[in-house]
């Protein structure tokens, strides 16, 4: 024994610096049990015996911490785990951190490892036949008694894996009952606010429809979950669905699982009417219209001793119990009699609808009233093709009803905004007031009393007037003149003056707009000179403040810690002069170039303002990020499956690791949906998700409207516009705005692709280093994944090149539209587009 331990210690010393997996392989060799019978019991003390070599941890804790570690490689963990299972066959039955060990695999979404263990058969003859993962025998939590299908762990992907691992086990899982409250999984799905959604019932049914060979595991209806089972409070799944007005669940229960909606003198319909569950009332009406079997014989035509072929109750017994009026009868083709309710129950639950007395098949008039239940579908393998055709017709009827229950899809076209002269500055003044309000708080926090904020426009100096406009109410007038809308005009004036007084008290230069005159007076002089010595205009001041507040203040905390040292990612707040020059260039030199007459562009043919683009149309292909970058860091994720999941959910994620420096915070470039597999890791202060902010079409449209407003004002200030130039028509403005929005979204696409290329390149460099250091074989799965990532990088490089070329084409088209067709300076348009592109790229 001493020699054995000495060799083991020597082996561990040689391996401890090489591989964490090999160390645990030694643990398994040191911990092989001596008594076979004890190993078959998960409560045995063998599984809780501490091992001194590993800080007195038992084998369950060691294996649990190992496979659940985020650094565990899912491609290499399977072999040592199988070696442990050969000697500890029920180790995944044992409790680890208050839950069975196999439940943690689901909770952490280690689907690849779970699928391998589900199909693994123990080779050791002593333990052959023991189930490694007892998902269909034991609950996931002994305190709540819930099975896997009753918990939030039952995702669509998990159900697909379980079905592939054996339909018999899956059916056993469906039939599991929570002994705490006497419920099955249908009770959990029927409740709208439960952990499992009602759509899970539909997915399970469709899995059975796609795999009819599971009929060999069904002997009768008792081997299928009971849709009429009552819980400890006497509630059936249909009762719970009606209480929640969950119409989808009720439809699935009746049509797919054979819930008896017709029993107890239509008690379900009465309950739905009392609870005002209007959606469920429609479902019950649909069931009565399509699935109810009407009597074909009057009760007074029956003999007193006529007996039902299903429940064996005679007409005389029905009269004695007072059920003559509530129960109706149906005469079969074989001249036997059955209660209509009994026949409907048989049609819902039975696979072969036959007379129970003589086993003669029922006619088509009965089969056409049978719901397309799962149990009946599985038993159709033994029936004729004619029965299959009737079943498919009823199933299509069910799908049509399901589609009819969906809320109507309403497509709201973009609002057509007409910029009248009196309202042209509405948005700019409103946003400027918000900037002024934020300026007070910022100056107070930083103690800066000399900040320059050109808030509003002066009412004195050289003036020009805009045409007045009739207003129907005070709200319209307040919006047009940029005033806060209050019914009490005096209160509105006091609020505005208090804001100006606070700014003046802080030493901030304040200019006041004359709001009393419906003819607005806009000053072109008396503009406060900036500290940078460059002349400002009101529009340039507004753009400068917008960029300053939205760009610099939001990204100055976006720093990372590399090797313990804080490194700023992008600290542009120290170079405000460059930003001011960029903002000023948006307005300069609009009237210095000559124009030649060129045929105008047909806006309607280029862009459809009523079309709402989807994600791919707006942002390009979703393949611009590499989800497999976290395969080895997060553990137990199938690269190819996660790649498909990414393409469906549009998830963007990147992560880089280094052997010399440990990166504690990495930038995350977001998609429209976040997968729970990927966690954002950031340090410092949190900042807004500017990607999602810019993707909102309303925000992009704000920038586009400001773009058009600046160009339109430049034309209005020209004394002698070119003869060929067409004025801004109200009908063309919304189309121009949408065209610029499209340009903004292409800017975002290109910026995201550039960031993704950078992160992927870092990951590929890191993995190339690991491949050489670990001396991995060319056939190793890690090398194959690296090769795939390099191919994806090449594909993304081509995509970003095409995006950049498309962006250049759109830039030239916009310059042509504004310069040649509308008379705006080409240099000014170029600067406008350049600042928008820089703005989008900075916020990514």
Curated annotation (Swiss-Prot):
ZnF segments: RING-type: 308-359
Pathway named in the protein's UniProt entry: Protein modification; protein ubiquitination
Keyword Nucleotide-binding in annotation: yes
Keyword annotations: ATP-binding, Host-virus interaction, Metal-binding, Modulation of host ubiquitin pathway by viral E3 ligase, Modulation of host ubiquitin pathway by virus, Nucleotide-binding, Transferase, Ubl conjugation pathway, Zinc, Zinc-finger
PROSITE patterns associated with the record: ZF_RING_2
Disruption phenotype: Reduction of host mortality.
Any one of the GO BP annotations: protein ubiquitination
Protein name (Swiss-Prot/TrEMBL): RING finger containing E3 ubiquitin-protein ligase WSV222
Organism: White spot syndrome virus (isolate Shrimp/China/Tongan/1996)
